């Protein structure tokens, strides 16, 4: 590795460990209702009663899982585990499979349609958590979500995937194909 590449790598890692990850750990964890706050204002104020989105939670899960896998810091594992638990316990629809698009600030489903986009991000997060920890539960849920995408989004006639949403095991085609 040449000096410029090494310096850039060190600078990026410093920024990640001293600014980016601490921001999420110190400002966005919701200790009252679980998971993570769903919104922060431009001047850094948490919006305590903002809804919580599946994409944000899944991205936090992936980010802290990958950070733990690479850097092995226990606080990253703790944050990743918090995100995994919240995703499975609150966002996952145990009855009809899939990930709710949005919860209210207390963790109750608000938008119960399952967007394939959210399922994809949940798979990324859960599979990275499994990769970092070997956690079988995360892998099992990632596989379940993959099967839901195959069941509700694959279009064998066009041999591709539709951007669909479903609520109760009924797929509804949206305006575009992936």
Predicted regions and their residues:
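Internal, well-ordered domain-core segments that constitute the primary functional module
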Residues: 117-154, 158-162
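Non-membrane alpha-helical structural segments and their capping/turn regions in soluble enzymes
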Residues: 14, 51-54, 74-81, 113-120, ...
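Aspartate-rich (DDxxD/NDxxD/DxxxD) Mg2+/diphosphate-binding motifs
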Residues: 39, 98-113, 160-169
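Short, flexible active-site-proximal loops enriched in glycine and acidic residues
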Residues: 90-102, 117, 155-161
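Low-complexity, Ser/Thr/Pro/Gly-enriched N-terminal "stalk/linker" regions
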Residues: 1-53, 74-82, 86, 90-99
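Well-ordered alpha-helical scaffold segments within catalytic/enzyme domains
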Residues: 1-10, 59-74, 121-135
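Solvent-exposed loop and edge beta-strand segments that line ligand/cofactor-binding
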Residues: 5, 9, 13, 43-59, ...
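Conserved small/polar residues in nucleotide/adenosyl-binding loops
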Residues: 167-177
């Amino acid at each position: 590795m040449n000096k410029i590449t090494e310096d850039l790598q060190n600078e990026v890692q410093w920024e990640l460990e001293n600014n980016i990850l601490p921001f999420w750990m110190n400002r966005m964890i919701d200790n009252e209702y679980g998971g993570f706050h769903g919104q922060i204002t431009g001047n850094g104020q948490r919006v305590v009663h903002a809804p919580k989105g599946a994409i944000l939670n899944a991205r936090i899960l992936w980010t802290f899982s990958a950070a733990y896998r690479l850097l092995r810091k226990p606080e990253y594992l703790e944050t990743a585990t918090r995100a995994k638990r919240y995703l499975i316990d609150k966002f996952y629809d145990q009855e009809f499979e899939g990930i709710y698009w949005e919860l209210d600030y207390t963790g109750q489903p608000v938008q119960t349609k399952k967007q394939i986009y959210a399922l994809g991000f949940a798979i990324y997060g859960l599979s990275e958590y499994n990769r970092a920890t070997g956690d079988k539960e995360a892998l099992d849920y990632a596989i379940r979500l993959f099967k839901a995408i195959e069941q509700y989004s694959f279009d064998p006639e066009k041999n591709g995937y539709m951007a669909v949403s479903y609520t109760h095991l009924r797929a509804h085609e949206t305006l575009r194909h992936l």
